[in-house]
Amino acid sequence: MIIRELKGIDEMVDQITVLNELYPDLNQEEYAADLAEMLPHNYGQVAVFEEDECLGISGFWIGRKLWCGKYLELDNIVVCSKHRSKGVGKLIFDYLHNKAKENGCTMIALDSYTTNYKAHKMFYNEGFAPRGFHFINILDDTGVRG
């Protein structure tokens, strides 16, 4: 298995089938439009491959907040169902942990649905701990996935 950062919209859109495991209704046009807005704001993606097959993917953001300084936020960690429990998620976490350190980040953050217990176990195993709540107030649910 190899892990590498995906560069540009076309390379990211090429891996949409992995994201479709999480968002089955996401299509290429909509995904490309979202990426066009996200990429200029410190968004990136990392993917794990075995030969030409993408086994897992994660988006990430590097930003700064008053309360924590510079941080890296994981966004949509998805491992193909047929490749779970093979170390794909661990490879993604390790890569992004090193990227955060190389970029001078003080912490790594992520959001998770409260009912995603399998993911919670993995997050705990990777040293994450719940520190607060992520409250939302949906203003228009037409753009909300998941």
Regions found by a protein language model. Name each.
Residues 36-47, 73:
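A short helix-loop-beta-strand connector motif used in the catalytic cores of GNAT acetyltransferases and
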